[in-house]
Swiss-Prot record:
Associates with the EF-Tu.GDP complex and induces the exchange of GDP to GTP. It remains bound to the aminoacyl-tRNA.EF-Tu.GTP complex up to the GTP hydrolysis stage on the ribosome. InterPro entries: EF-Ts_dimer_sf (IPR036402), Transl_elong_EFTs/EF1B (IPR001816), Transl_elong_EFTs/EF1B_dimer (IPR014039), Transl_elong_Ts_CS (IPR018101), UBA-like_sf (IPR009060). The keyword Amino-acid biosynthesis does not apply. The keyword Cell membrane does not apply. It is found in: Cytoplasm. Coiled coil: none annotated. This is Elongation factor Ts. Signal peptide: none annotated. One of its GO terms (cellular component) is cytoplasm. NCBIfam families: tsf. It comes from Thermus thermophilus (strain ATCC BAA-163 / DSM 7039 / HB27). Belongs to the EF-Ts family.
C-alpha cells in the first residue's frame, strides 16, 4: 500500500485531518497500528482541551431492541444546536443508546458510584483473595484489579464499546470530540427492560 493510500485509509477510519494523519504516520514510522494509537492519544488531548467548555445543547438518543423488550433513552449534550443536528453526533447518540441496551451499565461515570458501594466491592474482593490464601498486600492488589473489572461492567464510559471492543466508550466520545471540535457529554440515560 502506498503512503498516499495509507493516509487516505487512516483518514477514513479515524476522521482525523490529512496533516494529522500524515504526521502520526511519520512519527510511527508508517506503522498503521502505531499511527492509529498516536491519533487516538492526540484526539484525547484535543478532547481534554474541550472538556472544560459547557455542553448545554444536544439530543435525546433512543434505541428499541428488535424484540421490543428493551428500550433506552440517552441524553447526549454538545455546545451548539448546529452540532446537535450533525449526522455524526446523532449516530453517536444512537450507538450509545444501543450500547446501553446491550451492556446494561448502571452509571455514566465512575464518579457517580457511591463511595460505600465501591468500598463494599473492594472489601468483598479482598476477602475473596484472603480466603484463597493470598497475603494481605497481594489480596489488595488483586482487589484493585477486580475493582477495575467491576467498573468496566457497571460504568458506561469504562465499558468496551459493543461495536468495537478494542475501544472504550469514553475513547469513542473523545474521537467524536476530536472530529466535531466541540465538547460532548453523556448527561444521563434510562434503560427499560420488560419484566425487569
Amino acid at each position: 500500500m502506498s503512503q498516499t493510500e495509507l493516509i487516505k485509509k487512516l483518514r477514513e477510519a479515524t476522521g482525523a485531518g490529512m496533516m494529522d494523519v500524515k504526521r502520526a504516520l511519520e512519527d510511527a514510522g508508517w506503522d498503521e497500528e502505531k499511527a492509529v494509537q498516536l491519533l487516538r492519544e492526540r484526539g484525547a488531548m484535543k478532547a481534554a482541551k474541550k472538556a472544560d467548555r459547557e455542553a448545554r445543547e444536544g439530543i435525546i438518543g433512543h434505541y428499541i431492541h428488535h424484540n421490543q423488550r428493551v428500550g433506552v433513552l440517552v441524553e447526549l449534550n454538545c455546545e451548539t444546536d448546529f452540532v446537535a443536528r450533525n449526522e455524526l453526533f446523532q449516530n453517536l447518540a444512537k450507538d450509545l443508546a444501543m450500547h446501553i441496551a446491550m451492556m446494561n451499565p448502571r452509571y455514566v461515570s465512575a464518579e457517580e458510584i457511591p463511595a460505600e458501594e465501591l468500598e463494599k466491592e473492594r472489601q468483598i474482593y479482598i476477602q475473596a483473595a484472603l480466603n484463597e490464601g493470598k497475603p494481605q498486600q497481594i489480596a489488595e492488589k488483586i482487589a484493585e484489579g477486580r475493582l477495575k473489572k467491576y467498573l468496566e461492567e457497571v460504568v458506561l464510559l469504562e465499558q468496551p464499546f459493543v461495536k468495537d471492543d478494542k475501544v472504550k466508550v469514553k475513547e469513542l466520545i473523545q474521537q467524536a470530540i476530536a472530529k466535531i471540535g466541540e465538547n460532548i457529554v453523556v448527561r444521563r440515560f434510562c434503560r427499560f427492560e420488560l419484566g425487569a
